[in-house]
Design a protein with these regions (language model features):
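Trp/Phe/Arg-rich N-terminal binding region typifying the photolyase-homology
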Residues: 1-161
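Glycine/tryptophan-enriched, flexible segments
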Residues: 123, 142-276
């Protein structure tokens, strides 16, 4: 791996610092850039909402703040992954690229996989497993065994601080503040309450769930009236990757040793396979 290359860490559904393999491995040489690709067409697609966009805003603000503690920051590229690849090539730079697998399977197959397949012809590309995703395993009989094995692996180390985060002007990105102004806050909010995003919010939900809210989870998770209080409320955080599924799994195993809600937590453990 050439020493003059810049490591580029691509964020999509892994908006966290802790137990983020792409971020850790991309930070080892301490010469890296962290980029979130904001694709307007993706956010205009079916299943996307203004609520999700504001949840993303929280996640990105917190991620940027945490990256600044590492002498780095979150840069924003506006466009799809094909346009991002063209920008890479046009910059004439030398890069190593780091990705995590995405749980957004359709988008991953159509956009991110295309970028990876093109980029490996020109750059060093590193793709890491995330959340138990098994994209090449067609034998589903072994799926749960492999999932358990991945969850029981050690979490990766925290990322290294950045020593060189100079911005290549040929490679066009914008600041997070500008993204929020032109692409997020420009949408009118037609709601009052929204679930806060970010790793800190995810950690608080996890702790209150283990401490008290999980009581009668196995019964009340299907109740429209009670589920809001007795479910983990972590699905959005798993979807955006603000908290590592492996971290939750390991913390759950420790909690099961002493919890007075063991039967409820065992039900939760089964549903972790589906990120609920």
């Amino acid at each position: 791996m050439a020493s003059d290359r810049t490591d580029i860490i691509i964020f999509h559904r892994n908006l966290r610092i802790r137990d983020n393999e792409a971020l850790y491995h991309g930070s080892i040489r301490q010469k890296y850039r962290c980029i979130y690709i904001f694709d307007p067409k993706y956010w205009q697609g079916n299943g996307k909402s203004i609520r999700q966009l504001y949840f993303l805003k929280d996640c990105l603000i917190e991620l940027d703040r945490n990256l600044k503690n590492l002498n780095s920051k979150l840069e924003i590229f506006i466009g799809d992954y094909k346009e991002f690849y063209k920008s890479l090539v046009n910059s004439n730079g030398q890069y190593n690229l780091y990705f995590n697998h995405s749980t957004d399977i359709n988008y991953y197959n159509s956009q991110i996989s295309s970028l990876i397949n093109n980029a490996i012809k020109k750059y060093d590309v590193n793709v890491f497993r995330d959340f138990g995703v098994q994209r090449t395993n067609i034998n589903r009989d072994q799926w749960s065994k492999l999932w358990d094995a991945q969850m029981n692996e050690n979490m990766c180390d925290n990322p290294m601080p950045n020593k060189d985060c100079r911005i290549d002007k040929k490679f066009f990105t914008i600041s997070l503040d500008k993204l929020i102004k032109i692409k997020i806050d420009s949408h009118q909010r037609d709601f009052i309450k929204i679930q806060p995003g970010g790793s800190e919010a995810a950690e608080k939900l996890l702790n209150t769930f283990f401490q008290e809210r999980c009581h009668n989870y196995r019964i009340k998770m299907s109740s429209p009236m009670d589920a809001v209080d007795h479910c983990s409320r972590l699905s959005s955080h798993f979807a955006f990757g603000t908290i590592s599924l492996r971290y939750v799994y390991k913390k759950l195993k420790r909690e099961l040793l002493t919890s007075k809600y063991k039967s409820d937590l065992y039900s939760f453990k089964k549903r972790l396979y589906w990120h609920c």
